[in-house]
Swiss-Prot record:
Catalysed transformations (reactions): (1S,2R)-1-C-(indol-3-yl)glycerol 3-phosphate + L-serine = D-glyceraldehyde 3-phosphate + L-tryptophan + H2O
Highest taxon above the source species: Bacteria
This protein's pathway: Amino-acid biosynthesis; L-tryptophan biosynthesis; L-tryptophan from chorismate: step 5/5
Annotated EC: 4.2.1.20
Record's subunit section: Tetramer of two alpha and two beta chains.
Protein name: Tryptophan synthase alpha chain
Top class in the EC scheme: lyase
Active-site feature positions: E47 (proton acceptor), D58 (proton acceptor)
Molecular functions per Gene Ontology: tryptophan synthase activity
Length: 268
């Protein structure tokens, strides 16, 4: 397939800082200002959550953000429209960084598989992360997604055996996404020597059995954790901490300001 933005980015020999954001959280009208603030603050990739009423792997902060987004009228078609506007520079500066969508199978099936892939590609989406899509059952989806120029990123956990790590690495288009711990999103306790040793051992094992890049998410909230993950992986994903930083904003403009202020703490 022709290279999209994320494929081109992953050819660069450096570490990456990735944001996860739930559209229209905490307020309607927040998404485009947040995307602009993140891009101006030097984000490498933005993951946009597709809210679902029954998320199986999300911690309480992201669950609450999803429920808020749904209450604010967010749905897949609306997210794709926001991506179109972002790419065109309607309501914000033109967004040129890679945009990924992260969500669960059920809403995508309800939307219509090929219709979703076509609409996502046309809107300017670069790739997809679907936590409940088993790699072993994804061959047809992968083929179709790549036909629309979309990357597909699969997940690795601390319990993934070495041979399966290699299989996931082979299937993921550009990089794999590692859960930093066996816990729901953002709820992990990363303190303590034992936990640190476990994480380091796990990520060294991933490095040993992968050829492509991999990034780490779940529980990363400050510059120290970003640098720790950069020493072990190719990128760090910050989501829960970002949502916590902006959840008390009272206007979309304040959401954007809080986003920029928080992201600055991760960059320096």
């Amino acid at each position: 397939m022709a290279q999209n933005r994320v494929s081109r980015l992953m050819q660069e020999d450096r570490k990456f800082l990735i944001a996860y954001y739930m559209p229209e959280f905490p307020l309607p009208g927040s998404t485009l200002p947040v995307l602009e603030a993140l891009q101006k603050s030097g984000v490498d990739i933005i993951e946009l959550g597709m809210p679902y009423s029954d998320p199986i792997g999300d911690g309480p902060v992201i669950q609450d953000a999803a429920h808020t987004a749904i209450g604010n009228g967010v749905h897949i078609a609306g997210i794709l429209d926001l991506v179109r506007k972002a790419r065109a520079g309607e309501g914000c500066e033109k967004i040129t960084v890679p945009l990924l969508l992260m969500g669960y199978c059920s809403p995508l099936i309800a939307y219509g598989g090929d219709c979703f892939l076509s609409d996502a590609s046309e809107a300017g989406v670069d790739g997809l992360l679907i936590p409940d899509l088993p790699p072993e059952e994804a061959e047809d989806f992968l083929f179709r997604a790549r036909g629309f120029g979309l990357s597909v990123i699969f997940f690795i956990s601390p319990e993934t055996p070495p041979e399966r790590i290699g299989m996931i690495d082979g299937l993921s288009t550009d990089f794999s996404y590692c859960f930093a711990v066996n816990a729901t999103t953002g709820t992990a306790k990363l303190a303590g020597a034992d936990s640190e040793r476990d994480i380091e051992s796990y990520l060294r094992r991933v490095r040993e059995h992968t050829k492509k890049k991999f990034v780490v998410g779940f529980g990363i909230k400050d510059r120290a954790r970003v640098e720790k993950m950069w020493n072990l992986a190719d990128g760090a994903v910050v989501g829960t901490a970002l949502l916590q930083a902006i959840r008390n904003a009272s206007t979309p403009e304040e959401v954007a300001l809080m986003t920029a202020e928080f992201w600055k703490t991760l960059k320096s």
